[in-house]
Amino acid sequence: MTDKEMKLERFKEENKDAVKGQIVLTGSSLMEMFPVNKFLAERGSDIIVYNRAIGGYITDELMQVLDTCVFELEPRRVFINIGTNDLSDSRIPMDRIMEHYDSIISSIEQRLPKTEIYLMAYYPVNYEAAAENMKECLKIRTNEKITAANALVKQLAEKHGQHYIDINDGLKDEQGRLKAEYTIEGLHINEQGYRAIFDDFLKYLEN
């Protein structure tokens, strides 16, 4: 069983005891690694958040597991960050990424018409601060490509009457890159980086 499959099986078990009508996070590693529940606990918050993101997922994979990662929980609000792994793959064209994303949104709307959907802007990267083994990936997943993708994600949100949220300002240096001190290897974000955006994110959890 792969790491992805093991996580999915664990989520299926955890869903049996989960409280419905709460908040769900889903997507790939940048959402999986966001320690939202740790930060909420530090503030004494009673907001219930279920993180159902799985590292390594592309849009096509999330489409196949919406039952486990969204539907079974019947959330009142779902936050999605999916597509960055697609952006890192030169074989996957942008229009296909957005077609898959569109299908994900439509599926949620059909199954859970009362659920509010929040599409999160993709985070910036930092090629200069990247580990050597990440530089090839970041030649494909550039900040220019991320900016273009974010404009399309925003259009998707508008098309569906859903929400697009960009909380990236706190992550960026003067050149619009992910701040070097906030990244693990040029691409993923460390806890300090997530703290820098949590206050902005919290507004959407609370409102």
Label the predicted regions.
Residues 112-116:
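A short helix->loop->beta-strand "cap" motif at the edges of active sites that frequently abuts
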Residues 124-207:
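Catalytic His-Asp segment of secreted/periplasmic serine-dependent ester chemistry enzymes
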Residues 2-103:
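Conserved SGNH/GDSL esterase-like catalytic core that processes O-acyl groups on lipids
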Residues 101-106, 150:
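Generic structural signal for well-ordered alpha-helices
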